[in-house]
């Protein structure tokens, strides 16, 4: 604050850092010039943002906020009229802690908050290594924040808002150079460097800390996905989507009609369609509102695409990078420039006045800093990231409060987005169709380790995309119906939604029947398909592949989905880890032909299924409790 660093509470004087003995407590001393503890309060958890649920896209009604308690510690300084509160949230039935700080200025004038560190957590080292290492193993925790950007996975958190650091006090560690990363610090890489006027309050971003009880990868992945469903439950909304390639009125109406016929739930006027979210003219708003009303009359949600980052807008409105640095995507406007303010004004206006339900926000804000001193929304470099992030976070929170679905190719889940890319390479759609089938399943298999099925979208261009010609293209759909059905089975069988991009979903009665078959399959088993995935065998083209869907709270507690890429049927004995289904007694096994069998799990919590998977086909097996 105003150039001086202050500790918030805390004691010092511990003789060694390897362990702590209670008898040392009496000899510890406060940090000099620190804020001092005043009081502690316990409250019910309050929602950090308003969420208008879309139950038609959810298989389970998730509570909001997540049940638990908030604990607030208040600290004051003997010489400053500044109050600091340290907030914790603890949740029912989860080893998860959330933490953030708030600062209230009671001075007669403004203060400047240059930086903050909202968490300093000394942890037991994950490994005890004498020698130098390039890639250290970190303590067994999952860390998330709502200040994370610049990529589709949470790994970017180390570049935005947290760090694992060495502890200079830990002189008794094994590592010769004292380089073991044992201290978690939560702090922005820049700023915030903001002015806090008299009576104003500053609130930091939040961190969530999930403590794992095992290094078993499946168990850790389950724990992480459960945490995300609890603290960002809008990720469980999983609408069935189509990307219509043209935003012309009749093209959009055709897409809406076809979606309604086969059970799709959402139409997105995609990139390159001609939809312009920045056109807030009365004529455009009137036309789009007419399309929205038409879609709603058919039970279909409608919205469109807007590009934010990776574009150059000129006029002094682009980010000004320090020497030697470039924007994340080569070009980017500054969100706090004159253009940025007008851009968001237009988005608010067109979504308010048309009632659109979905925004596909490409690039989003990737965290680019800006050294300009001419932009109206920030002072210079040090506050530029913080101020730009506030703009995007406030907009996404508004979208959540309005029930506007957010497809964002960035990791904004905890700030309000619903879905990001599952993980794929776009140029793979120029490969022959038969190659795409297995690669698609690999992408789903890998992506659902770290995401729930509803958190990641896949992409299926029905028309030519990135080249490849006829061999790579699904249109005409009726001419490539077996391949089209495999793609439907790949994705609906995984509970993963794709953006099916083209002018139509079907072009013949037989095509329509196949699409409806798999939509009906997903809707019939939505609760289990939206549940967690236990990975059985990764696709490699050499044998069967598949996974086990689990939902311990549902009637259908398990759904085994198996695929055969070979040109001959395969008979296999497959171990199924039914432990994860929560079934305690006998297991009712329902085979694809309707045959019922009862089985008991072994001492490892598994059953053995003797399966016959047809050539170049798939099967699913349902598991229930007797």
Spans of features found by a protein language model:
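Polysaccharide-binding surfaces and accessory modules of carbohydrate-active proteins
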Residues: 1-181, 190-192, 585-597, 609
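Glycine-rich, aromatic-flanked loop segments that form ligand/cofactor-binding clefts
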Residues: 27-51, 210-224, 287-328, 352, ...
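Short Pro-Gly-centered flexible turn/kink motifs
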Residues: 37, 194-212, 614-624
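An acidic-aromatic substrate-binding cleft motif
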Residues: 217-266, 270-273
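The substrate-binding groove and active-site-proximal loops of carbohydrate-active enzymes
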Residues: 238-249, 270-285, 325-344, 376-388, ...
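Active-site-adjacent "subsite" loops/lids of carbohydrate-active enzymes
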Residues: 248, 288-293, 297, 301-356, ...
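Active-site-proximal substrate-binding groove within the catalytic cores of carbohydrate-active enzymes
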Residues: 392-595, 608-612
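C-terminal beta-strand-rich structural cap/linker in extracellular carbohydrate-active enzymes
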Residues: 600-626
């Amino acid at each position: 604050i105003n150039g001086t660093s202050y500790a918030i509470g805390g004691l010092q004087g511990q003789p060694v850092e390897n362990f702590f003995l209670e008898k040392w407590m009496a000899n510890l001393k406060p940090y000099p010039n620190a804020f001092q503890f005043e009081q502690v309060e316990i409250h019910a958890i309050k929602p950090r943002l308003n969420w208008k649920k879309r139950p038609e896209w959810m298989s389970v009604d998730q509570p909001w906020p997540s049940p638990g308690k908030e604990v607030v510690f208040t600290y004051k300084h003997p010489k400053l009229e500044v109050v600091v509160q340290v907030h914790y949230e603890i949740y029912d039935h989860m080893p998860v802690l959330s933490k953030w700080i708030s600062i209230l200025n009671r001075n007669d004038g403004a203060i400047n908050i240059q930086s903050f560190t909202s968490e300093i957590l000394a942890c037991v080292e994950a490994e005890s290594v004498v020698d130098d290492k390039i890639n250290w193993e970190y303590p067994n925790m999952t860390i998330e924040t709502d200040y994370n950007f610049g990529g589709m996975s949470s790994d970017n958190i180390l570049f935005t808002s947290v760090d694992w650091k060495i502890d200079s006090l830990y002189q008794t560690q094994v590592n010769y150079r004292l380089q073991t990363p044992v201290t978690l610090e939560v702090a922005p890489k820049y700023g915030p460097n903001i002015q806090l006027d008299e009576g104003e309050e500053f609130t930091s971003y939040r961190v969530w800390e999930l403590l794992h009880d095992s290094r078993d990868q499946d168990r850790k992945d389950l724990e992480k996905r459960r945490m995300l469903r609890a603290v960002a439950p809008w990720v469980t909304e999983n609408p069935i989507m189509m990307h219509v390639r043209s935003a012309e009125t009749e093209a959009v109406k055709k897409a809406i009609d076809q979606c309604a016929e086969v059970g799709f739930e959402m139409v997105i006027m995609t990139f390159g369609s001609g939809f312009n979210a920045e056109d807030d003219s009365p004529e455009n708003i009137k036309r789009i509102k007419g399309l929205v009303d038409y879609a709603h009359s058919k039970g279909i949600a409608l919205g469109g695409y807007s590009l934010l980052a990776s574009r150059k807008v000129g006029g002094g409105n682009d980010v000004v990078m320090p020497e030697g640095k470039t924007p994340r995507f080569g070009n980017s406007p500054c969100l706090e420039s004159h253009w940025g303010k007008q851009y968001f004004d237009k988005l608010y206006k067109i979504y308010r006045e048309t009632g659109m339900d979905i925004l596909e926000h490409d690039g989003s804000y990737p965290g680019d800093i800006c050294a300009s001193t001419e932009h109206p929304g920030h002072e210079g470099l040090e506050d530029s990231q913080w101020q730009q992030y506030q703009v995007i976070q406030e907009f996404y929170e508004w979208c959540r409060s309005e029930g506007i679905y957010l497809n964002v190719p960035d990791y904004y889940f905890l700030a309000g987005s619903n879905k990001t890319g599952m993980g794929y390479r776009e140029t793979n759609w120029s490969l022959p169709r038969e190659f795409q089938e297995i690669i698609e399943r690999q992408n789903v298999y890998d992506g659902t380790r770290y995401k729930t099925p509803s958190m990641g979208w896949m992409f299926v261009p029905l028309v030519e995309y990135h080249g490849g010609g006829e061999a790579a293209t699904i249109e005409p759909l009726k001419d490539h119906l077996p391949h089209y059905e495999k793609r439907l089975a790949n994705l609906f069988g995984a509970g993963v939604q794709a953006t099916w991009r083209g002018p139509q979903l079907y072009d013949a009665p037989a095509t329509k029947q196949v699409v409806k078959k798999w939509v009906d399959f997903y809707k019939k088993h939505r609760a289990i398909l939206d549940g967690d995935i236990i990975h059985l065998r990764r696709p490699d083209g050499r044998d069967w592949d598949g996974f086990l869907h689990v939902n311990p709270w549902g009637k259908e507690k398990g759904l085994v989905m198996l695929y055969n890429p070979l040109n001959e049927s395969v008979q296999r004995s497959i171990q199924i880890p039914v432990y994860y289904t929560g079934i305690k007694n006998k297991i009712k096994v329902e085979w694809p032909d309707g045959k019922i069998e009862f089985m008991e799990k072994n001492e490892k919590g598994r059953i053995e299924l003797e399966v016959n998977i047809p050539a170049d086909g798939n099967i699913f097996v349902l598991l229930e409790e007797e």
